[in-house]
């Protein structure tokens, strides 16, 4: 294999939104970790990556070859002496977080997308990223898919919030969510940091994701010089991995 590292988005790429990877995906990732380095760079939290992916990998998976980048690359964790260690975390200040949360409340109310009966938290302060979920963090997948099938409501919210927060990066996350990080802290930042710290050049990396459209949280990766593959489901990703093995 000419590639030295394969980087994956999580929701919609390796697994359904907020769901675990399949048994077939877990086996395929274990096989991939045996032959190359793998990075998971997701808008989700460290806990979500651990729950959805790491905890589902078969015993004996080579975790030394696994890099974790939660919150869209704003954090980086690496296995060190049998434990996950934080390499960096680009967190908001309390004042920044307060301003972002205030703008999200105002924008969602203005556009009529604040839910009356949310499934869990609507605004999730993840330290290095703040995520707005239009139906709540724990909404069923079927309801999320039905809420905004053409993505117009989510994209309108993203544009509105971005216009009010020009000093931050605002991107589409999952099917009903938008993600906000510090300016310049996105998945391209994560890829650049990964290259710098692993000494792997961008042309030796393949990125796989389902939000590579402009405004999507995978889109910044396109400008980094890595090869990239747009997928539309975890099933498609599984086929891609098997073809790489």
PLM regions: where:
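Mg2+-dependent phosphoryl-transfer enzymes with acidic/Ser/Thr/Gly-rich catalytic loops
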Residues: 1-3, 21-22, 181-183, 187-245
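Active-site phosphate-binding/coordination module
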Residues: 20-119
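Short, solvent-exposed loop/turn segments at secondary-structure boundaries
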Residues: 18-21, 145
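Short loop/turn segments at strand-loop or loop-helix junctions that form parts
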Residues: 6-11, 71-73, 126-127, 133-137
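Conserved acidic, metal-coordinating active-site core of Asp-based
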Residues: 115-206, 217
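A general structural motif
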Residues: 1-3, 35, 63-65, 127, ...
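Asp-based phosphoryl-transfer active-site loop
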Residues: 2-19, 40, 68, 191, ...
């Amino acid at each position: 294999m000419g590639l030295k590292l394969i980087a994956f988005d999580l929701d919609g790429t390796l697994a359904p939104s907020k769901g675990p990877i399949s048994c077939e995906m877990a086996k395929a990732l274990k096989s991939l970790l045996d032959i190359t380095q793998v990075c998971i760079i997701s808008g989700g939290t460290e806990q979500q990556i651990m729950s959805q992916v790491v905890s589902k990998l078969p015993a004996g998976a080579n975790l030394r070859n696994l890099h974790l980048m939660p919150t869209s690359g704003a954090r980086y964790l690496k296995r060190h002496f049998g434990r996950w260690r934080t390499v960096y975390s680009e967190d908001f200040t309390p004042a920044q977080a307060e301003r972002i949360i205030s703008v999200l409340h105002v924008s969602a109310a203005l556009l009529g997308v604040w839910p009356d009966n949310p499934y869990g938290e609507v605004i999730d302060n993840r330290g290095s990223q703040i995520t707005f979920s239009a139906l709540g963090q724990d909404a069923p997948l079927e309801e999320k898919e039905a809420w905004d099938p053409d993505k117009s409501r989510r994209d309108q919210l993203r544009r509105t919030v971005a216009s009010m927060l020009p000093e931050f990066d605002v991107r589409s996350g999952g099917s009903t969510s938008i993600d906000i990080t510090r300016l310049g802290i996105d998945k391209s930042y994560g890829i650049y940091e990964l290259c710098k710290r692993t000494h792997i050049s961008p042309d030796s990396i393949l990125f796989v994701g389902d939000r590579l459209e402009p405004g999507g949280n995978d889109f910044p990766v396109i400008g980094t010089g890595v090869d990239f593959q747009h997928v539309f489901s975890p099933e498609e990703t599984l086929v891609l991995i098997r073809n790489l093995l």
